[in-house]
Amino acid sequence: MRHIRKHLAALLCAAAVALALLPAQVWAQSWENGFLTVSETQGNPLYPAQVTADDSNGTSLLAAGGMSSFDTAAQAADYIARQFKARENMAFFYTGYPADGPFLALTSGEESAAYSDEEQALVNGGTSRAAILQRRQLLKYVRHLVTEELLPEVFRYIPDDPTGGDYMRTQYRDVTYAADYDGYTFGVSVTFTYFTTAAQEAEADEAAEELLDFLQIDSKTDYAKLQAIYGWLCGHVAYDYAHQKDDTYLIKNSAYGALVDKAAVGQGYAALLYRLALASGVETRIVTGTGRGEAHHWNLVKLGSKWYYADASWDVGRQSWSYFLQPSLLYHVPDDASLAVIRTCPLSDAVFSTAPGRLNRDDSIDILDVQLLYTYLATGAVPQGDGVLPEGDFRLAADVNADGTVDVYDLQTLYETACGLR
């Protein structure tokens, strides 16, 4: 094993990986001493235009030594997720490949494709066509392994993980994956170009905790939590027009930029709202797509049994919010990946009512609402009937004084409101 790793080190130290605009792909391949080596860089599919050819900070770590070994995709994905959160690169041995080797069969088009410049150089140096095709098969397998098996699991949505799921999925610019295979050992490295460093994420962790304490989030209802977080974003984070068109300034896309630097573009606003809301116990997703025809990010948030849209970056500086807890957003077009998520989230068909106490759908606070709340307090069960809000929405609206508890004080307040005494 030590002998193999020394050969891996020699190979990978010699491989230079550059970036290229999608769909162009970067190949750094060599065939020496019986080793097959491939690598490729792909931009984050959310914003491929940000991938450039001359500013990658990623290099393969296959030469690092001391790598872990995994025999299932789930184990490898868990390792990648932990390394991602630490803003580290990663390399590992993988034994979960098919019995006949880490290769995928080529289509006729892939097999007959013209040689790339790098392949032609290898052919000119004496590399056989069979070896070139084997490289293509290995590259196809590692591409499939990383992008279709590992990363979807790495970015899987977990409601109680504020810095996982959608947060990680939107916080890197590109990924380079490389593989080495000698007929016995299959090594993989995955290198992300992150928007932030580990130190910046640690600073954001501390700042997020301090902000939530300042907002007294723990004492609020879910609606009041979102209202406080959204209000802080709209009032304290400036839209980063200075770097809006600068694709090399990655901080603008991050929660760190919004929280610590107090400046971000839409992606940074959405990432921070996601992070703060999940840390507060409110389910949230990040929606990706276009806003007025340009790449944009916004949020879905869950209140009661329904989901609502929110876009803090479009409400910055407004006295009244037009993009908070809406059933739809004008000029916002989700991409296919987000549409798949949205289909699993039952959307509200109306703007969230910011007037607690409306326990049915008649848009007024009257004696019927008082009767519904009295029944709920007496029986402990949400009343059933035409027009009565679903259970989750009912409990939210029933907390009339927004103290986090539904009790006789809410009933008294609701009665006085219905009678015109408030």
State what each model feature region is:
Residues 3-27:
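Sec-dependent N-terminal signal peptides of Gram-positive bacterial secreted proteins and lipoproteins
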Residues 19, 23-28, 354-422:
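Cellulosome-associated attachment modules in secreted, modular CAZymes
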Residues 28-187:
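Intrinsically disordered, low-complexity N-terminal segments that are enriched in acidic
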Residues 31-36, 306-355:
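His-Asp-centered catalytic microenvironments across diverse enzyme cores
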Residues 75, 79, 137, 203-210, ...:
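Extracytoplasmic/secreted proteins, especially bacterial periplasmic and envelope-associated proteins
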Residues 196-258:
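Secondary-structure boundary elements
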Residues 213-217, 231-239, 274, 278, ...:
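Sec-exported extracytoplasmic/periplasmic mature domains
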Residues 268-332:
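Hydrophobic/aromatic-rich core segments of domains that either
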